[in-house]
């Protein structure tokens, strides 16, 4: 007996909220597999080879992973060469602004933004950074 993943309407709703971001971001792709669900690929922009993949089985997982990637995109634009776990207050404001169009479509997932920034803040508490 073969197992088949089911792409729920909620998963499709989450994917559609990120469609503009996915179309404009060359370093990632999102694929659907009936065997494993959504597959999030990171792509090396120089070699055009996949670097990693992650299986995502639920709408919250999918949304969280894409919000994480959006935050990383903002951090890379700062050219400070660090990830979002080291962001400062101004960068947190930029990340929230970048997330805004998606969260307007998915207000029930706004809590994920808070979780991401809270985790970043917890990682930086020893440095006295306040991301709120």
Regions from the PLM with identified roles:
Residues 34-120:
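Acidic, low-complexity, intrinsically disordered interaction modules
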Residues 25-28, 36-38:
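Short, surface-exposed beta-edge/turn micro-motifs
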Residues 19-21, 28-32, 53:
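Short, exposed beta-strand/loop patches in secreted or surface proteins that constitute
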Residues 129-132:
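Non-Sec secretion/translocation targeting segments of pathogen effectors
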């Amino acid at each position: 007996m073969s197992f088949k993943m089911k792409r729920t309407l909620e998963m499709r709703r989450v994917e559609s909220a990120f469609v503009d971001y996915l179309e404009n971001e060359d370093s990632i792709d999102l694929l659907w597999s009936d065997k494993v669900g959504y597959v999030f690929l990171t792509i090396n922009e120089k070699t055009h080879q996949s670097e990693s993949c992650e299986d995502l089985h639920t709408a919250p997982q999918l949304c969280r992973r894409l919000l994480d990637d959006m935050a990383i995109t903002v951090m890379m634009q700062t050219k400070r060469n660090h990830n979002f776990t080291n962001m400062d207050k101004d960068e947190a404001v930029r990340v929230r602004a970048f997330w805004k169009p998606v969260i307007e479509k998915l207000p029930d997932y706004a809590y994920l933004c808070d979780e991401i920034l809270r985790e970043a803040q917890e990682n930086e508490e020893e440095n006295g950074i306040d991301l709120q």
